[in-house]
Amino acid sequence: MADWSPAAYLRYTDERSRPFGELVARVRRDPASIVDLGCGPGHLTPALRERWPGAMFVGLDASPAMIERARATDPEGRYELADVRDHAAGRGPVPAADGADLVISNATLQWVPGHLELLPALAATARQTFAFSVPGNHDAPSHRLLREVAGGAPFADVVGPVERRAVADPADYLEILAAPGWEVDAWETTYTHVLPGEDPVLRWISATGAQPVLHALDAHDAAHGTGLRARFDAEYGAALREAYPRRGYGTPLAFRRVFAVATRAD
């Protein structure tokens, strides 16, 4: 997949940042060191510094564009290019022997194939706390329509099957992480965001969940000049406008998030 766009991702930074604040608020212990898995453009680092000003921090992300943006925005921070699976296996920039008191991740693990099976290994890299949130909206109209439109002609031959990301319910995450010596707090929240402007749901999902589809269409257009991306945006945008009608105050978007905080017992 082509790289992410930090600018597009940050268009709704307040709405995207809110779950991270809720996640951080549920961390009970004070870490001396923090690893942020999937740190993105570094826009959430201030929340960590504000909560734990003396902690050492490392942000990891698999996107070169995101790491470049994070380093430019926060030159005093440490941001490294790394894959979540490498970190779980102890092959990343943070040696397994060093670990971190807090390993935290916001809206990243849903992109990792087999992330449910990877959770115990990720938790093992945390000396005190492993905390994460993932979007739980993959059955929402936005994502269902993405699969339907992308799965129809003429897009399906270009983008291939659109995967439904395997995100579990809070009870499932509790079951996976509740090993001896761990205390787990798992919950879910549905936010109702009010998005301004024209086609805001299309702009929202185009920066995140629709990325694999859009990158495939853009690559095809670059090679063949077919204009499939514009046609897809028109068809998908029309379906989203019907599913998420604009009101006088903006366009409401219900967005479910699932959280888990696993803490080693004292």
Residues covered by each model-derived region:
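Class I SAM-dependent methyltransferase SAM/SAH-binding core
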Residues: V35-L37, P41-G92
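A short acidic, Gly/Pro-enriched loop at the edge of an enzyme's catalytic core
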Residues: G90-L102
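Conserved Class I S-adenosyl-L-methionine
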Residues: P41-H43, A166-D266
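Conserved class I S-adenosyl-L-methionine
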Residues: M1-P31, H43-A47, M66-R69, D86, ...
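A short SAM/SAH-binding and catalytic strip from SAM-dependent methyltransferases
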Residues: L102-H115, G136
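Local beta-strand N-terminus motif with an aromatic residue
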Residues: P31, G99-D101, R127
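Conserved catalytic/acceptor-binding region of the Class I
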Residues: L116, R127-G197, P212
